[in-house]
C-alpha cells in the first residue's frame, strides 16, 4: 500500500460559534425553556457547539411563522420571483462550499473528499434544478393550476445532513410552500449555517425555519395541527410511528426509510469494475447510506475471484481523520450507532458467518469501525436481514439469475439494488424483476437532482428528486 503524507483540510475556513439558537421567522432566537445539547466531532469526541433544544412552544412559534409567511408572502409570490431566491441560495452555497464541506465533515465524521466532491455539488445542483421549476409548475403535468400545500414539516437524518436538507427544502420552496425543518440532533451545524445563508440571500422571514432537538422536538413538529405536509428520512421504526401519528389527518406524507440493498454480480461482469462498485456501494460514507449495497450476491462460479479482488482492494482503504484529503473511511457518526454496528457484527460471527477485516489501526479517540465483510452468510442471518448502517458487507452466493432475484427480493425493504453484468438484456431482465425503487446497472450510488429516488415496502413511499419530487409538495 502506498504511504501518503497527511493532507489535512484547514479548519480555519469555518467559524463555529460557541452556541446556536433556533432559527425562527428569519432570526436566531433562544428556546423558550432554555434547553440545550452538545454537538460533537465524532472523530475526536470534541464538543463543537452548544445547540438550542426546541420545545413544543418553540415548534409552535416556528409553525406560526411559516404559516404567516406562506399566506402573506411566499404563497402569493409569482414563481419567477421564488426562483430568484432559490437561484441566489444555490449560488451562495457554491461560493461557501468549502466552508460547508469542512463543517459537514467535522460534525458528521465523513471524509472531506466526499463532503467536498459529492455532497456539496449535489446540494447546489438541487437548488439550481428546482429553481428552474418554480415558474413552470402549470406546465409540469400536474394540471393547469397546481397549488402548494402550505406548511411543510421536514425531519432529516444524520448521514447526509446538508444534502437531505436540499432534497427537502428545494422542491418545497419551488412549489410555494414554507418549511419548518428539524435536523438530526447529532448533525445540526450545516443546517444552522444554511439558516445564515437564507439570511444572506434575503429570503423573506418565516419561509424557512429550523428547530433543533431530539425525538421530542420531531414529534411535536410532526403532530402539530398547523402542518400540511410531513416529509421524513430516517429509520423504518420511526417512519412507522410517524405514519401512525399522521393517519386520519389531512397531512400529506413522504417517507424515505431504511434499506438492505442487494448488489448482484453475475459471472460475466467486469470483475475489477464490479469490485470498485462494491466498495463504493458499502464503504462510501462509512456505510451510513440508506441505499448502501450491504448484501453482495455473487454468482458461485466467480465468487472466489471477486472475494480475492475485493479483499485486496479493501486493504488499500485508508481510515482516519475525516479532514485529511487522503481518507477513504471516516468516523462512525455517534457512540450509539457504533454500538449498533458492533452488536450486529458480533451477532453475525455468533451465528456462524466468517468475519474478515483488513489490517486497520483505529484511532484512540472517537467512534471507529474497520471495514468488514462476512462470508458464509445465509438469508437467516441477522446481518443479511437487518439494516446495519455501517461499513459491513454480507456476502451470499447464487447459481442462476432467478435465484439471484429471489434472494435480492427476500427482504422487507425495497429501496435500491445494483446489477453487474456484460449483457444489456440481463440488466433489463433482472431490473424488471427486482422490487426496488432505484436500480443501478454497472455502477452504484449515482445521484442526480433530475432523477426521482424512493422505495417500496418498508423503505417508505413517495419520491424525492426530479419532477416527481415536486408532486409531493403540490395539491394536484
What are these regions, as identified by a protein language model?
Residues 136-273, 398:
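Rossmann-like NAD(P) dinucleotide-binding subdomain of oxidoreductase/dehydrogenase enzymes
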Residues 46-50, 203, 227, 264, ...:
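Conserved C-terminal structural/oligomerization subdomain of aldehyde/semialdehyde dehydrogenase
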Residues 237-378, 441:
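ALDH superfamily catalytic-core signature
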Residues 67-70, 74, 90-97, 101, ...:
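Structural signal for hydrophobic packing residues in well-ordered secondary-structure cores
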Residues 46-137:
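Glycine-rich loop-to-alpha-helix module at the N-terminal edge of alpha/beta enzyme cores
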Amino acid at each position: 500500500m502506498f504511504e501518503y503524507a497527511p493532507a489535512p483540510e484547514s479548519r480555519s475556513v469555518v467559524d463555529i460559534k460557541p452556541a446556536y439558537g433556533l432559527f425562527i421567522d428569519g432570526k436566531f432566537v433562544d428556546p423558550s425553556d432554555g434547553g440545550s445539547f452538545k454537538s460533537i466531532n465524532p472523530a475526536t469526541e470534541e464538543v463543537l457547539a452548544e445547540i438550542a433544544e426546541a420545545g413544543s412552544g418553540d415548534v409552535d412559534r416556528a409553525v406560526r411563522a411559516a404559516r404567516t409567511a406562506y399566506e402573506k408572502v411566499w404563497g402569493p409570490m409569482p414563481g419567477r420571483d421564488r426562483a430568484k431566491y432559490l437561484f441566489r441560495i444555490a449560488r451562495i452555497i457554491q461560493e461557501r462550499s468549502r466552508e460547508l464541506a469542512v463543517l459537514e465533515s467535522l460534525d458528521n465524521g465523513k471524509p472531506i473528499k466526499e463532503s467536498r466532491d459529492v455532497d456539496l455539488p449535489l446540494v447546489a445542483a438541487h437548488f439550481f434544478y428546482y429553481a428552474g421549476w418554480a415558474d413552470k409548475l402549470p406546465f409540469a403535468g400536474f394540471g393547469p393550476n397546481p397549488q402548494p400545500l402550505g406548511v411543510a414539516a421536514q425531519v432529516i437524518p444524520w448521514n447526509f445532513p446538508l444534502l437531505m436538507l436540499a432534497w427537502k427544502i428545494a422542491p418545497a420552496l419551488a412549489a410555494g410552500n414554507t418549511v419548518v425543518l428539524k435536523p438530526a440532533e447529532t448533525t445540526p451545524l450545516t443546517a444552522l449555517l444554511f439558516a445564515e445563508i437564507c439570511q444572506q440571500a434575503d429570503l423573506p422571514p418565516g419561509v424557512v425555519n429550523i428547530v433543533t432537538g431530539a425525538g421530542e422536538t420531531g414529534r411535536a413538529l410532526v403532530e402539530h395541527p398547523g402542518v400540511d405536509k410531513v416529509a421524513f428520512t430516517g429509520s423504518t421504526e420511526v417512519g412507522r410511528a410517524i405514519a401512525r401519528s399522521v393517519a386520519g389527518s389531512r397531512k400529506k406524507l413522504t417517507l424515505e426509510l431504511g434499506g438492505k440493498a442487494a448488489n448482484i454480480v453475475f459471472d460475466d461482469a467486469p470483475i475489477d469494475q464490479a469490485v470498485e462498485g462494491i466498495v463504493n456501494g458499502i464503504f462510501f460514507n462509512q456505510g451510513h447510506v440508506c441505499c448502501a449495497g450491504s448484501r453482495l450476491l455473487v454468482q458461485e462460479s466467480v465468487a472466489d475471484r471477486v472475494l480475492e479482488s475485493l479483499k485486496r482492494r479493501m486493504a488499500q482503504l485508508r481510515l482516519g481523520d475525516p479532514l485529511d484529503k487522503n481518507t477513504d473511511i471516516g468516523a462512525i457518526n455517534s457512540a450509539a450507532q457504533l454500538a449498533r454496528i458492533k452488536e450486529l457484527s458480533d451477532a453475525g460471527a455468533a451465528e456462524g458467518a466468517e468475519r474478515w477485516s483488513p489490517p486497520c489501526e483505529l484511532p484512540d479517540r472517537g467512534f471507529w469501525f474497520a471495514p468488514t465483510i462476512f462470508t458464509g452468510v445465509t438469508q437467516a442471518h441477522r446481518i443479511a436481514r437487518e439494516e446495519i448502517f455501517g461499513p459491513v458487507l454480507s456476502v451470499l452466493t447464487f447459481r442462476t439469475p432467478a435465484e439471484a432475484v429471489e434472494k435480492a427480493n427476500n427482504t422487507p425493504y425495497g429501496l435500491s439494488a445494483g446489477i453487474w453484468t456484460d449483457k444489456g438484456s440481463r440488466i433489463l431482465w433482472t431490473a424488471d424483476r427486482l422490487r426496488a425503487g432505484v436500480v443501478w446497472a454497472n455502477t452504484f450510488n449515482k445521484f442526480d437532482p433530475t432523477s426521482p429516488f424512493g422505495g417500496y415496502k418498508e423503505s417508505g413511499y413517495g419520491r424525492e428528486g426530479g419532477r416527481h419530487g415536486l408532486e409531493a409538495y403540490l395539491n394536484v
